[in-house]
């Protein structure tokens, strides 16, 4: 549970790997340590979270750019405030000028601008880790909400990737390699949000089409060579860019059009180039280390519902960041003029430097409290995402050996090209 974020225990048999610091609930076991110290799973997770916390989200660049000019601007405002009150203010002019200038310097809070994004990112990374979603950077957290297409590997990602030793080998492979729990629900939730789903597979069209229809995948690209997945990701990106260029003359963009990023979900060594090529790489935690090192997000439990959790986490994080930035900007835009005495001609009231100091401190406290609200965010698959797939969906199946597409009900084509990077 500590690693996967799931409440139910995981059964282990002889020869299975176990994770240090997890709890043995029943029975006895003899273990052999294969990774110690910084190489253990927990240490790697802690290091990954620490590295992610040290990164900056792209939205932070706006705050950094404003903060760069903020202090000089406040100094200029304070000097102008002092000069205006000395020359035009009521007696005692010097006292009023000093009070207002000092109040401006005290109430101004550049720290609020600097803290707005990092606070939300830090809490969000912790929330994700608690739910089995490990993001390697703040940028990944920001981008996940803009996913428009999710490309899945088949074996080990959508399916279990394990065949029972007592299996009937006369049966088709899709009857031996069963679909993972949660795969149908995850695909249905993505489709309910208007996100396109694609499956990349090296399997024959018959096998790939059957699995795709079972989980509700929109499009299948089958018979892909082991080193050809990155090519198909790049092709999807080119198609997206061409479509965006054609619609560039439009006057408005819908919410669906703003979701343009392509995510790749995979678990194997052959998925690593595609994970790196995709706008957002999502690795299955039960897969290879190479895949996880190439990805932007790792799903520790291997459950594809983690993709929905990632998108929900991104939405919650960006909403919280916008709230924090709105508060930071609003506080300074309102507080600085009040401290400068803009209300004095109407109310005869000047802000005390002590009250200004209290307001400055409380502004940062409010940011911390708002960021901590993320701890209560629900990032699980919700009822609004739609019901789980019924398995009656029709998928478009495209063979990597043919440039033509065929409906799943009429699958044609076989791999004939020897070049891994050509369709």
Q: Which residues are covered by each model-predicted region?
A:
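Actuator/coupling domain of P-type ATPases
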Residues: 1-101, 178-179, 197, 304, ...
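Conserved cytosolic headpiece of P-type ATPases
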Residues: 1-12, 29, 36, 40-44, ...
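Conserved beta-strand/loop elements of the cytosolic catalytic core of P-type E1-E2 ATPases, chiefly
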Residues: 3, 34-37, 49-50, 54, ...
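Residue-level signature of catalytic and energy-coupling elements of molecular machines
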Residues: 5, 18, 33, 45, ...
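Hydrophobic alpha-helical transmembrane segments
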Residues: 56-154, 176, 190, 212, ...
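Conserved phosphate-coupling serine/threonine residues in phosphotransfer and NTP-handling enzymes
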Residues: 110, 117, 201-203, 286
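Membrane-embedded alpha-helical bundles of multi-pass transporters
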Residues: 127, 195, 215, 238-259, ...
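Short, well-ordered beta-strand core segments
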Residues: 150-151, 220, 281-283, 298
């Amino acid at each position: 549970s500590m690693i996967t974020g799931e409440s139910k225990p995981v059964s282990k048999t002889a020869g299975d790997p176990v994770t240090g610091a997890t709890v043995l609930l029943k029975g006895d076991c003899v273990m052999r340590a294969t990774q110690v110290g910084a190489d253990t799973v927990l240490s790697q997770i802690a290091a990954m979270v620490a590295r992610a916390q040290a990164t900056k989200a792209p939205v932070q660049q706006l705050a950094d750019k404003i903060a760069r000019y903020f202090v000089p601007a406040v100094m200029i405002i304070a000097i102008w405030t002092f000069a205006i009150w000395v020359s035009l203010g009521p007696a005692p002019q010097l006292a009023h000028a000093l009070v207002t200038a000092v109040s401006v310097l005290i109430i101004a809070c550049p720290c609020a601008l600097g803290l707005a994004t990092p606070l939300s990112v830090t809490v969000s990374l912790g929330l994700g880790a608690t739910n089995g979603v490990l993001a390697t950077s703040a940028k990944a957290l920001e981008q996940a909400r803009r996913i428009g297409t999710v490309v899945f590997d088949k074996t080990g990602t959508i399916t279990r990737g394990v065949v029972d030793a007592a299996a009937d080998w006369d049966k088709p492979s899709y009857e031996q390699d069963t679909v993972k729990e949660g795969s149908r629900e995850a695909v249905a939730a993505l489709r309910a949000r208007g996100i396109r789903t694609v499956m990349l597979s090296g399997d024959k069209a018959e096998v790939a089409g059957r699995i795709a229809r079972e989980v509700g995948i929109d499009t299948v690209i089958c018979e892909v060579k082991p080193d050809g997945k990155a090519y198909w990701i790049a092709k999807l990106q080119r198609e997206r860019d061409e479509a965006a260029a054609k619609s560039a003359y439009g006057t408005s963009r819908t919410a669906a059009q703003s979701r343009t990023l392509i995510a790749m979900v995979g678990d194997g060594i052959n998925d690593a180039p595609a994970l790196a090529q995709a706008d957002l790489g999502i690795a299955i935690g039960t897969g290879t280390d190479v895949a996880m090192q190439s990805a932007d997000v790792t799903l520790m439990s291997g459950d594809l519902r983690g993709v929905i959790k990632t998108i929900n986490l991104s939405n919650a994080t960006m909403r919280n960041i916008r709230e924090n930035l709105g508060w930071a900007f609003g506080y300074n835009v309102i507080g600085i003029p009040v401290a400068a005495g803009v209300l004095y001609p109407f109310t005869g009231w000047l802000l005390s430097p002590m009250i200004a100091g209290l307001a400055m401190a409380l502004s940062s406290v409010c940011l911390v409290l708002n960021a901590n609200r993320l701890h209560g965010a629900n990032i699980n698959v919700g009822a609004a995402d739609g019901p789980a797939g019924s398995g009656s969906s029709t998928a478009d199946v495209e063979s990597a050996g043919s440039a033509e597409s065929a409906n799943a009900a009429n699958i044609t084509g076989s791999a004939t090209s020897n070049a891994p990077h050509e369709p």
